[in-house]
Design a protein with these regions (language model features):
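N-terminal carbohydrate-binding/catalytic regions of secreted carbohydrate-active enzymes
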Residues: 71-100
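Glycine-rich phosphate/ribose-binding loops and adjacent secondary-structure elements
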Residues: 271
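Bacterial Sec-dependent N-terminal signal peptides
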Residues: 1-24
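Aromatic-lined, polymer-binding surfaces characteristic
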Residues: 76, 87-90, 104-267, 276-302, ...
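Intrinsically disordered or highly flexible coil/loop and linker segments, enriched in small
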Residues: 52-56, 96, 178, 280-283, ...
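Extended polysaccharide-engagement surfaces of secreted carbohydrate-active enzymes
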Residues: 307-341
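Low-complexity, Ser/Thr/Pro/Gly-enriched N-terminal "stalk/linker" regions
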Residues: 22-78, 109-113
């Protein structure tokens, strides 16, 4: 009898051990792995195709029923510029042999060739640098990607490519920006030129910095132009670009009426509000124009987590968990990706 009991106990432990082993194998990927995998899934179709000069041939455009008839080629710069502004800091991490490290290395190789093709008139993926005013917006994101991670982007480009970007950015000066957050797009390309020692339009920088300071309302919120609009543009554009432009001005001893420290404090106050919009279930209210920019609504939280630290009362784990849950909810829905990603 005792022998049977002992055998049953041993057998039970064996079953439990097998169960625990299976559980270990079936554990979901970490938050970090999910972020890295999602970044790769979004970036790979754009960068791989563009590195081969095949983005404009293969990218499937979806046009709104209310499309205004503008040149469709603005979509290619929009896809490339905004992608690189988002992932360039990630690509600047030190190389390693992890699965994530291999993803970063591959994306960076594609990105460097894509940067080259974007300004090469002989490339099928030469981007649209003249014409619609929208190109000012998306060129600013390319400039922002250089500012955010120069060692992984700008400094690795050949001299011919760098000179082409300089001329393309200067060529955008003929575009008159709208009297709202677009002043920052105009200023972003000039801030980048200033950062690399090129001649910059200091008047454009002054106007943008001064006007945004005038449009600051209170409690972390800027007005997007003379009139306030309740949307996510404080996170999409205003706080991130304003802070980054001011950082360049400070580094280059270009005097401004507002300090980088103050601008960051304003952004951190905004972060307190924006984090509280995320529900325990990982949802957030959809309001205001451009709501389809999705995770861009929390760019200020991501920027602070990466570069400045979070405001008092917000922990890294709290923000990481909130953003991870939002991403899982958003990108697990069918229709985000097609069979070609």
């Amino acid at each position: 009898m005792k022998t049977r009991i002992i055998l049953l106990v041993v057998f039970s432990f064996c079953l439990l051990g097998d169960t625990f082993a299976k559980r270990k194998v079936e554990e979901p990927p970490s938050d970090r792995q999910q972020w890295a995998d999602l970044c790769y899934k979004i970036a790979q179709p754009i960068l791989e195709n563009m590195s081969k000069g095949e983005l404009q041939k293969n990218m499937q455009l979806e046009l709104s029923p209310t499309w205004d008839g503008r040149d469709k080629r603005v979509a290619y710069m929009e896809a490339f510029g905004r992608l690189m502004a988002g992932i360039s800091p990630w690509l600047s991490l030190p190389a390693d042999n992890t699965a994530e490290g291999q993803q970063r290395r591959q994306l960076q190789e594609w990105a460097l060739q894509a940067y080259k093709n974007a300004v090469d008139p002989q490339s099928p993926d030469y981007l649209l640098w003249e014409g619609p005013t929208q190109i000012l917006v998306d060129a600013a994101y390319i400039a922002e990607s250089f500012l955010r991670a120069p060692d992984a982007t700008w400094k690795l480009l050949d001299e011919v490519t760098r000179q082409r970007y300089i001329q393309c950015f200067k060529g955008l000066r003929i575009i008159r920006p709208a009297y709202n957050n677009w002043l920052l797009f105009r200023a972003m390309t000039e801030a980048f030129l200033l950062s690399i020692g090129e001649e910059a339009d200091r008047f454009a920088l002054t106007v943008a910095v001064n006007k945004l300071n005038e449009w600051y309302l209170s409690d972390g919120w800027y007005s997007d132009g003379p009139e306030f609009a309740l949307d996510y543009y404080n996170s999409y554009v205003i706080h991130p670009m304003y802070v980054e432009i001011l950082e360049v001005c400070k580094a280059k001893k270009f005097l401004t009426p507002v300090s980088t420290v103050l601008a960051i404090c304003r952004m951190q106050r905004f972060n307190v509000f924006i984090e509280r919009l995320i529900s325990p279930e990982g949802t957030y209210p959809a309001f205001g124009r451009s709501v389809i920019y999705r995770m861009g609504a929390f760019q200020t939280l991501a920027l602070a987590s990466w570069k400045y630290g979070l405001p008092e009362g917000l922990s890294n784990g709290q923000v990481r968990s909130a953003l991870s849950t939002v991403m899982r909810n958003m990108f697990s829905i069918e229709g985000n990706f097609d069979d070609k990603n």
